[in-house]
């Protein structure tokens, strides 16, 4: 199967402690790697104010992960677990050219 590039952007709640945020990012990077994806880059982008309130939050820390993967298994697992995480307010997976 062909290797494809993806960009995953997720928003982390702003009131999380720095150590917990680092553990969260490491855990989700590991989920991708354990399911067959290669994490090319994983970094915080910025803490930004939202156009509308998400839950009780008006801002959040955007985190961007660039990955390559041969199948959708790692992305599907990331998507499934991100939906259950209270620390991730929103997430988006985009296939890159």
Curated annotation (Swiss-Prot):
GO cellular component: cytoplasm; ribonucleoprotein complex; ribosome
GO molecular function: small ribosomal subunit rRNA binding; structural constituent of ribosome
Cross-referenced Pfam families: Ribosomal_S6
DNA damage keyword on record: no
Protein's GO biological process: translation
Keywords noted in UniProt: Ribonucleoprotein, Ribosomal protein, RNA-binding, rRNA-binding
Gene3D superfamilies: 3.30.70.60
Family: Belongs to the bacterial ribosomal protein bS6 family.
Function: Binds together with bS18 to 16S ribosomal RNA.
Protein's recorded name: Small ribosomal subunit protein bS6
Gene that this polypeptide is encoded by: rpsF
């Amino acid at each position: 199967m062909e290797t494809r590039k993806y960009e995953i952007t997720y928003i982390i709640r702003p009131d999380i402690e720095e150590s917990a945020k680092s553990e969260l990012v490491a855990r989700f990077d590991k989920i991708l790697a354990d399911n067959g994806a290669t994490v090319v880059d994983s970094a915080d982008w910025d803490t930004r104010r939202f156009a509308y309130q998400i839950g009780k939050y008006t801002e959040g820390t955007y985190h961007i992960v660039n990955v390559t993967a041969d199948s959708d298994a790692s992305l599907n697992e990331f998507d499934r677990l991100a939906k259950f995480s209270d620390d991730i307010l929103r997430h988006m997976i985009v296939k890159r050219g």
